[in-house]
């Protein structure tokens, strides 16, 4: 059944075309997951009785947010960082991907369904890795049983391996095989390989049958080939998609396979939806979600495949799937400042990997927000906390009607008493996202913007007389309420305007949203565009004081203040301490607690620690996950500067430094260029040089003990000082 024409790559740059297809694949993944997430776990019968067919988002009908943290999204965009973190190896080893799991996953909190050893396949594989069992044995059926190892999870994280190898299905298949074997085995790995090969091939080939034929050639599993052949046969003769769903239920339901979420039923349903949906993006997702089983997984994979194959325009043929999403996504992981992300940022990451693997160069835009893809808004929306009438009537992209990129803001009837504003989330939402005993986990993140950083933006005014603008932040106060701080009004002249704004001090409290407000004394209607917007580098002086400075009404029973939530903790216990600021506590090795992001380059981190029971304690800098960082620590009467890389801890410098129990010391760790300096009570005691980590977050390290920490500060080191 061949109904689609072969895709011919135009004469223009293949890399530009692949970039657009990658963005469409990322968007398709998000749309599919968000569409299917609302009915994940529902039976086919219950979906049919409640909704009939699911053509569009139904999250509001089940009282759940649309944008949620999801294992399908976080795992997909995390695990492929094994490429970036290890120099983009073309010959990817399963062990490398397994080490990446351990670096970014926060146990019992992020990415995975934490259902228990022998119940959740991914949780089981994580525990194997943690125990020192390397991949691929960590995911083997010999160790974990066939029921565990042949579950669906092998393919749900697989899309980025395909998008990192556009037009190279052979290498995509090899990488997918290595990555899938971290947690799975047998038919689950083969199904993941087939899907990755099809997605990589879809960059240059759009015919459904050709893609399926190729996918079947790269797998090593005759039974899976037979099942796929049967699915294709049923789809060819079916009068309606429900006829195929009935056949799948009779022959390949969960009752036919071991485990709680087997691969084969879902893979068969995914391919049936792919075939029956033809070139209709919405139709394919409708079938995948309306058919039950693992709805978000199947729809997410299908959305990515068809996004790549059909392009962004196909996502816009039916209802507005893109508007409610606004490119937003959570990539929940130990690298907390990277959690709040968007489809453009993740597309850049994938493109960087693809370019490196193919020997090409890729220079992404310098600004965080450059809106370079068709219709991209990168999370900017009409500000949901705008007070009074909203004067901005539409948010879009200049590139939908012309050659330029930029966030287009249309405003109407601005005047005294009526302003307009847009904003973008920079930290977790006040509304909970988790649900106990499910894979609905809470957002674990650090803010992406901090007090005393500098916002730089280029705004283009199209009218002869334009409204003034001002930047603003909305931050959490010590009681968890939202407060707004606005900057001064800035005049816009027709044409492009370069603006800067120093983010005001929040006394260490986290910033929830950053926005731009339009203000006019006289009635104004028209449009402006944000061409780019960025903040980068460590904050000038981000300072957190004592616990009561942060939360004046704090009690000993308050354990989840938003300023505590701004840190990502792998330590077993991390909470406010009413006598200092933080309580750092961990019963084993490598209890890491961090905040900040990957654009923090040269800075000093400092805190006052009281040396209670501990094996090791100190400060972390340039953390890129929780198993890749520098630290200045005190351990066994010795001061050390260490570098951790996965399981390896290297001492870069050390000296004897006798100290007594309950002694209070001010520790400071500086990273500037390749130079690391460790100071105690204002005196430098150690220095070292290393080039492994150029930037990253800051925080604490605690091992086998509990230590109170009073205050926390991060101060930028100027370029001249860093180089001097």
Question: Where are each of the predicted segments found?
Answer:
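Structured, active/binding-site neighborhoods that engage oxygen-rich ligands
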Residues: 1-487, 506-544, 603
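Extracellular glycan-recognition regions
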Residues: 489-498, 510-724
